Amino acid sequence: MITHLVWFRQDLRLHDNLALAAACRNSSARVLALYIATPRQWATHNMSPRQAELINAQLNGLQIALAEKGIPLLFREVDDFVASVEIVKQVCAENSVTHLFYNYQYEVNERARDVEVERALRNVVCEGFDDSVILPPGAVMTGNHEMYKVFTPFKNAWLKRLREGMPECVAAPKVRSSGSIEPAPSITLNYPRQSFDTAHFPVEEKAAIAQLRQFCQNGAGEYEQQRDFPAVEGTSRLSASLATGGLSPRQCLHRLLAEQPQVLEGGPGSVWLNELIWREFYRHLMTYYPSLCKHRPFIAWTDRVQWQSNPAHLKAWQEGKTGYPIVDAAMRQLNSTGWMHNRLRMITASFLVKDLLIDWREGERYFMSQLIDGDLAANNGGWQWAASTGTDAAPYFRIFNPITQGEKFDREGEFIRQWLPELRDVPGKAVHEPWKWAEKTGVTLDYPQPIVDHKEARLRTLAAYEEARKGA
């Protein structure tokens, strides 16, 4: 008997799952599914408890959905990726598996694991798929067959390549000829988990698809005007579903095209498409420069920046107690919800690196430990952009002023007051510099003074980068 095994990883869905669709194409084959939890590996990679809770819920939904199609989901748990190789080998042997199907992961540890799996399964046909991207790594290259290092040329080449051949979405599998089966007992991951707002981050696949449709219909066209203001619900909130594979980027692209037909010509929705292309850019980069997975800066000389070791400042930043309201409100949103608005990710990252002169890798690590949408490529790309260590990053002398950033993107302080109740009585725009208002009025606030002077911090950071740049 032909037996196909689908190995689920970061692709926890039925619709538009390339590996699952390929495994189910042969109607006479027996199809099994496998998921391997690796708690120690997840801890090493700083996976957040909220993301673990999302994965746990998605796994149980997937198990039920697969059972309705007649496909049993086998759940296994081992410490790490190395141990998972033996599990795949064991499951294949126990079930006389003839073909293994899986979707590629581009991180360095995951790629090494997959090489070992294929090496171990000499009598099993292994098929991998570029499922987590719209265009696979290698499809968008320079004229010299090199990876683009600047986003705008990559974007232009990506769009040109897309117009030459639009990747289609594949349908969810039909019920196997054997009929539906009873699902196995519910899955419980052996990893710290924390609840989250399912209204913002849906668990069920159909709910994620509905959220995508609603955003593309009602939000994508206004995204350019609303995306920078954290007090406004102007972003898609789809990042968590993309990070765990509850949605595919192809689903996002096709729904966007359906609702905003002029998007490829720069019409409504094109700025949100730009964000999808940034996601592709960072994934392609990570494939060609695996050192990015090892917390190495893309620009070599920036590794010589003399970072400050200041646990008190790092803790103040993590807890939202720096004395700069827009930074603190953003960090408290992250700690409370597991999510942070993208504009605020830039502001808080810039503050940690360029006001506190703390190593960007500390921030990268902390974000991953809190984010429900934690994604190595996107998170690393964002931090290296803010720290001026990455490819096509902000220049090192670009340093956000945390006061003017608050005034620009939360003018009346609506977002700040939502997350900093101790400042709710500070009127109007005074909320951006509450220490001045407190001194003027004689009111004592239960809120810290700024832990650094921005002007002095800026000069210190410029000097540190310029010193590191010598000899570059």
Where in this protein do the model-derived segments appear?
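A broad detector of short, well-ordered amphipathic alpha-helices
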Residues: 21, 90, 206, 328, ...
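Active-site-proximal binding-pocket segments
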Residues: 233-422
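Short coil/turn segments at secondary-structure junctions
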Residues: 46, 314, 445-448
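Glycine/tryptophan-enriched, flexible segments
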Residues: 145-299, 409-410, 414-472
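Trp/Phe/Arg-rich N-terminal binding region typifying the photolyase-homology
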Residues: 1-166, 268, 463-468, 472
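An N-terminal domain-cap segment
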Residues: 6, 14-15, 229, 321, ...
